[in-house]
């Protein structure tokens, strides 16, 4: 439904290949994506909404970097539409996740087959980086039982909206503390020795939500995960209806815009239909 995009960029003249693949598609209640209220009122508003958005991608980013092979988020899997998939998570979660979302995921769209198409062996992957612990970002973990998986410790300690019953039984991620600073971002963890790939805390959607920034010669690639549903939301100060804390989301918006002004930043939210084209054309926020 959403074709993948691959670009070859550089860092100090060395190639950095970036692949963006969609592990199926999702649609949500319209007021889930585009809220007119905040907090509990936003939740009530979207639960009463009877209309869904159009189909949106579930992007996963794969980075072939001189320091290693990195997978950012793992996307969704085809079992999500199986009857009873959410029952282990309790009555409310089962009701919520079967009435507020719709998924369309084929087996070949899962992250494992997508990596195979790219000629990437799972055993060669250096790390999987999870931006946060929501379903459509962790549901491809089954392909990575022997891979180092990085999670922000704060996201792990104070989750929001996660479904741990759906984690693989072996899932014990490496918890990282974001105790450094990167430009406007107060909390950061460097993923490469040259500090050209960095995990930054971008809270709002969850308390410990993170994004990944890749600093290349041509541009900075900003994998934003669920900061917002689209670049348009960011630019027009519109918010989703499911933020853990609205004030945190507002602050993150301000930081992203401050970071992006005066430089070439390619902004890639996980569910933005136009993100692939922006990556292909290296179209910046400003």
Set out the residue ranges of the language-model regions.
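Conserved nucleotide-sugar donor-interacting segment of glycosyltransferase catalytic cores
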Residues: 138-146
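Cap/insert and terminal regions of metallo-dependent hydrolase folds
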Residues: 78, 83, 93-111, 217-286
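Glycine/small-residue-rich hydrophobic helix-like segments
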Residues: 178, 183-239
């Amino acid at each position: 439904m959403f074709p993948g995009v691959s670009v070859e960029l550089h860092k100090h003249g060395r190639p950095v290949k970036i692949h963006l693949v969609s592990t199926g598609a999702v649609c949500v209640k319209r007021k889930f994506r585009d809220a007119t209220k905040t907090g509990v009122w936003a939740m009530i508003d979207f639960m009463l909404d009877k209309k869904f958005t159009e189909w949106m991608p579930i992007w996963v980013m794969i980075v072939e970097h001189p320091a290693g092979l990195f997978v950012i988020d793992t996307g969704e899997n085809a079992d999500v539409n199986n009857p009873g998939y959410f029952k282990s998570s309790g009555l409310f979660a089962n009701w919520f996740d079967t009435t507020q979302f719709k998924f369309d995921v084929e087996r070949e769209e899962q992250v494992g087959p997508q990596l195979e198409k790219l000629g990437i062996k799972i055993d060669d992957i250096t790390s999987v980086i999870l931006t946060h612990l929501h379903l459509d970002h962790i549901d491809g973990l089954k392909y990575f039982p022997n891979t180092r998986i990085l999670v922000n410790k704060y996201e792990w300690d104070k989750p929001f909206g996660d479904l741990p019953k759906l984690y693989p039984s072996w899932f014990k991620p490496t918890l990282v503390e974001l105790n450094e600073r990167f430009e406007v971002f107060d909390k950061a963890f460097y993923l490469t020795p040259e500090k050209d790939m960095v995990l930054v805390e971008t809270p709002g959607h969850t308390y410990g939500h993170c994004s990944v920034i890749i600093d290349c010669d041509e541009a900075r690639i900003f994998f934003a995960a669920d900061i917002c549903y689209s670049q348009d939301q960011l630019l027009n100060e519109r918010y989703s209806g499911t933020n853990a804390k609205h004030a945190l989301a507002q602050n993150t918006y301000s930081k992203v815009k401050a970071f992006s002004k005066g430089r070439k930043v390619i902004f890639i939210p996980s569910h933005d239909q136009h993100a692939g084209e922006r990556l292909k054309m290296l179209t910046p926020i400003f």
